[in-house]
Amino acid sequence: MAGNVLVDAGFVVALLSRRDTHHPWAVAQAPQFAPPWNTCEAALSEAFHLLGTHGAPALSALLRRRSVVVVFELAADLESVLMLMRKYVSVPMSLADACLVRMTETLADPVILTTGTDFRIYRRHSRHVVPCVTPD
């Protein structure tokens, strides 16, 4: 089991929105990877936007309960994040994805819960697969 579970906006939205295609998958993953789940502010911004006014209270509750925790400070890792975004400009890599990949480089035993497939393309420390769990 991973020591640091990271979540992207896709997982959060899938978990909180019954209308999301990946909702059953996210609900099944949640107990297997118990909170707290680490994330970054960029991923939260995406999640709040995608959830809209109906889903925002549920995400706010996760934050208040500290089930989802921001453990990343962009200012401290700005150059590394910008370098990742430049490297993967053809994908393209979002700010949230770059922050999460950087988190996998700095946190011990990380895994990302994500509904996306881009993390299969990205590499941590330039050559290592980013550990992630996806719906496949």
Give the predicted meaning of each segment.
Residues 6-7, 25-54, 65, 70-73:
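PIN/NYN-family metal-dependent endoribonuclease catalytic core
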Residues 9, 18, 59-67, 124:
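Terminal helix-to-tail segments of small alpha-helical proteins
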Residues 71-112, 117:
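Active-site neighborhoods of divalent-metal-dependent phosphate/nucleic-acid chemistry enzymes
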Residues 12, 44, 119-120:
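A generic structural signal for short hydrophobic patches within well-formed alpha-helices
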Residues 2-4, 107-136:
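Acidic, PIN/NYN-like endoribonuclease modules and their adjacent C-terminal/linker elements
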Residues 16-22, 53-57, 105-113:
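Short helix-capping/linker segments at secondary-structure and domain boundaries
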Residues 14-16, 50, 122:
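Residues that scaffold the ATP/ADP-binding catalytic core of kinase and kinase-like folds
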Residues 1-20:
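Metal-dependent nucleic-acid phosphoesterase active-site entry motif
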